[in-house]
Amino acid sequence: MRVNVIKGDRCTGKTTQLQAIQEELKAQGIEVPIIIGERFTTPYFLNLISDQVLAGATHFLADDCTQFQIKAVQDLVAQGRNARLPITFIAHLVRQA
């Protein structure tokens, strides 16, 4: 699993960049919704990622993620094979400004 963290100050185009990734995936025939990270607790956020992996998804898109959510995902990636996440799965996370 790979993590792409999109950072920046307010109004710097982070969400626009995430939407561009979504459109690029859509052009490839891959439909991926954008979830709003701040609406979920960190454990539930991790469960959302796990659910997507189990469903066979290859990408996860999230806007307005807390630094705790991003750290938790990075910790999951650091576990490597123990986390049982496919290396082809990519999480695109926009950090809250």
Predicted stretch roles:
Residues 6:
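Hydrophobic anchor at the beta1->P-loop junction of P-loop NTPases
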Residues 3:
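Walker A (P-loop) ATP-phosphate-binding motif of ABC ATPase nucleotide-binding domains
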